[in-house]
A protein has these predicted regions:
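Conserved AdoMet
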Residues: 70
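Exposed, interaction-prone extracellular/peripheral surfaces
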Residues: 1-49, 57, 62-67, 76, ...
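Short, Gly/Ser/Thr-enriched beta-strand-loop segments that form substrate-interacting elements
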Residues: 73
Length: 323
């Protein structure tokens, strides 16, 4: 989906490189925005309950950069040359992995929104990272190293900037196939407009590893409504292909039908995997999807463990809760 463009149009590869450098330059401000959003959301979330037998089981790991000194187990560390951090076993096993689509299609912003899809997806990912870290969780990008502590979100931001500079657009548009640990969760941020025959194998590869998945579909409102009228030139963001419509409004009904069909097919796949879908439009506040996503990660007992919906209930994957 793309707005009308000038006749002189840079190649997709050049656009990707230019946008990657621009994204790296904007990352500090996006990180600030994400922390502001996460603090707003945190005020609306009640304290977590940490109950159950898992609290009595502990395991140790080496102290990492970004860990607080308060987490060091000094008794265990005294008998070694290393500093050790003590973690509850259920906390250590629970890692939330994230992935953000950084392909060219995510650069789209229409006149109906103040934020490109890419910026909003990054802000959502960083803000979610902050909330998870505040809850004691381990977070990381798929293919990276999960972390806890104050520096975890900074590492996610750094990883996103590096991947924007180094990844090809083909790599950027689909979730990676990196191995993940069982009992973890994965949150994917994208417009998810890729053909399902390309996307579905990637989702299945993650699901068979025993992880629970949550998809956040980030769309510009114009991608839902196709508000253009009259003679309009459209450009495919990732291929550079162009199409001129004499009366853009005449395409609206068929376009909307294809969007609905694509989303319904995606939802069918997610029902099969017992994963969830959340639709977010960039003209809406970022706090809205974060509250919903946090509730889904919290599950029924507010311990951040995903609970699949009851049989016959599809609220977790219905776009009716679109934010």
């Amino acid at each position: 989906m793309a707005p009308p463009v000038d006749t002189e149009h840079a190649s997709p590869i050049h656009e990707l490189e230019t946008r990657a450098h621009a994204l790296a330059a904007r990352m500090p401000s996006l990180l600030v925005a994400a922390r502001r959003v996460s603090h707003t959301v945190a005020h609306g979330i009640h304290g977590r309950r940490r109950r159950g037998p898992g609290e009595t089981f502990w395991q140790f790991r080496h102290f990492e950069s970004g860990d607080s000194a308060d987490t060091v187990d000094w008794r265990r560390s005294a008998s070694s040359d290393h500093l050790y951090v003590r973690e509850r076993e259920w906390e250590a096993a629970h890692t939330v992995w994230m992935w953000v689509d950084q392909s060219l299609s995510m650069a789209f912003r229409s006149h109906l929104s103040a934020s490109p899809k890419a910026d909003r997806a990054i802000v959502l990912a960083l803000a979610m990272s902050e909330l998870l870290v505040l809850g004691g969780e381990r977070v990381g990008l798929i293919g990276g190293r999960p972390r806890t502590g104050r520096m975890a979100t900074n590492q996610v931001a750094l990883g996103l900037a590096r991947r924007a500079l180094n990844a090809s657009d083909e790599d950027a548009s689909l979730p990676p196939t990196s191995p993940l640990g069982a009992f973890s969760e994965v949150v994917l941020f994208s417009d998810f407009l890729e053909p399902l025959e390309q996307l579905t194998p990637r989702l299945e590869h993650l699901a068979v590893q025993g992880v629970r998945g949550h998809l956040v579909q980030v769309l510009d409102p114009a991608e839902e409504s196709l508000p253009y009228t009259g003679r309009t030139e459209f450009t495919a963001s990732e291929t550079g292909e162009r199409m001129i419509a004499g009366r853009a409004e005449s395409l609206r009904e068929k376009y909307h039908a294809r969007m609905v069909a694509h989303r319904e097919a995606l939802m069918d796949e997610l029902r099969r995997l017992k994963w969830s879908l959340l639709v977010h439009h960039t003209d809406r506040p970022p706090e809205e999807p974060l509250l919903t996503l946090h509730a889904r990660l919290a599950g029924l007992e507010h311990d951040y463990r995903y609970r699949p919906p009851a049989e016959g209930l599809d609220d977790d994957i219905a776009p009716a809760g679109a934010a």
